[in-house]
Curated annotation (Swiss-Prot):
GO terms for cellular component: cytoplasm; nucleus. The lineage of its organism: Eukaryota, Fungi, Dikarya, Basidiomycota, Wallemiomycotina. The gene is HOG1. This is Mitogen-activated protein kinase HOG1. It is found in: Cytoplasm; Nucleus. Transmembrane segments: none annotated.
Length: 278
């Protein structure tokens, strides 16, 4: 049953739904291994040395390479839900929760910076490529020490993206279904792409190359986790024999049900009980 599917989503670089605990008072707690800090706090204290940037990026991609083939998309990746301990082990948390939130409701700032342009441009159709965009933003922030696209609101968010990447390409504009959005995009000043080398003078060629592949305006052209992890930049860590892929599609169908929150708790609870028996 579903318990099985969750069990298969156990992975070293992910804090899974199995670590959720529901108290008798119906509060949901997340039991996380005590990981010393998160990437947001780490980045605000000091610049990261290149070997750490590489190792952290590698572990994030290793997690995505595992879950994406199972049809699981995080949708809300940002430095504060990337947990890191003193051995530099990295785990992504809040997988599965992003699904419970209506993307239009999560307008708070920290998330917006890392949100892929197609989420703002089309709302309906988006897939695992949104996670790659978010990781690209986090990668840039690890290199540069500050958020790459600090938008003040939705509109400004798209503007700061076009200031670096240039105007959205035709094939992206053609996917926009909302007339209002289309008008907004057409009204944006036409911009040329700024060379990444110019924007990130401290980055080396391999970093620039991978970053450009992750921050592609077009989600269909954006590099996948499986391809990104094989990029020469990550060669020091890449080990095909130690990068598992989830072996079945994950059943999130219960997430689409329109249920009151207290019922959610029960469902999640039963999922976890089924699984912990194994």
């Amino acid at each position: 049953g579903r318990g099985n599917s969750i069990k298969h989503l156990r992975h070293e670089n992910i804090i899974s739904l199995l670590d959720v605990f529901i108290s008798p008072g119906e509060d949901i707690y997340f039991i996380t291994e005590l990981l010393g800090t998160d990437l947001h706090r780490l980045l605000s204290s000091r610049p990261l040395e290149r070997q750490f940037v590489q190792y952290f990026l590698y572990q994030m991609l290793r997690a995505l390479k595992f879950v994406h083939p199972a049809g699981v998309v995080h949708r809300d990746l940002k430095p504060s839900n990337i947990l890191i301990n003193e051995n530099c082990d990295l785990k992504i948390c809040d997988f599965g929760l992003a699904r419970l939130q209506d993307p239009q409701m999560t307008g708070y700032v920290s998330t917006r910076y890392y949100r892929a342009p197609e989420i703002m441009l089309t709302w309906q159709e988006y897939d695992s490529a949104v996670d790659i965009w978010s990781i690209g933003c986090i990668f840039a922030e690890m290199i540069d020490g500050r958020p790459i696209f600090p938008g003040k609101d939705h509109v400004h968010q798209l503007t700061v993206i076009t200031e670096l990447l240039g105007s959205p390409p035709e094939d992206v504009i053609n996917t926009i279904t909302s007339e209002n959005t289309r008008r907004f995009v057409d009204a944006l000043p036409k911009r040329e792409k700024i060379p990444f080398q110019q924007r990130f003078p401290n980055a080396n060629e391999e970093e620039i190359d991978l970053l450009e592949k992750m921050l592609d305006f077009n989600p269909k052209e954006r590099i996948t986790a499986a391809d990104a992890i094989q990029h020469p930049y990550l060669a020091p860590y890449h080990d095909p024999s130690d990068e598992p892929v989830a072996n079945e599609r994950f059943d999130w169908s219960f997430n689409d049900a329109d249920l009151p929150v207290d019922q959610w708790k029960v469902m999640m609870y039963s999922e976890i009980l089924i699984t912990s028996e194994f």
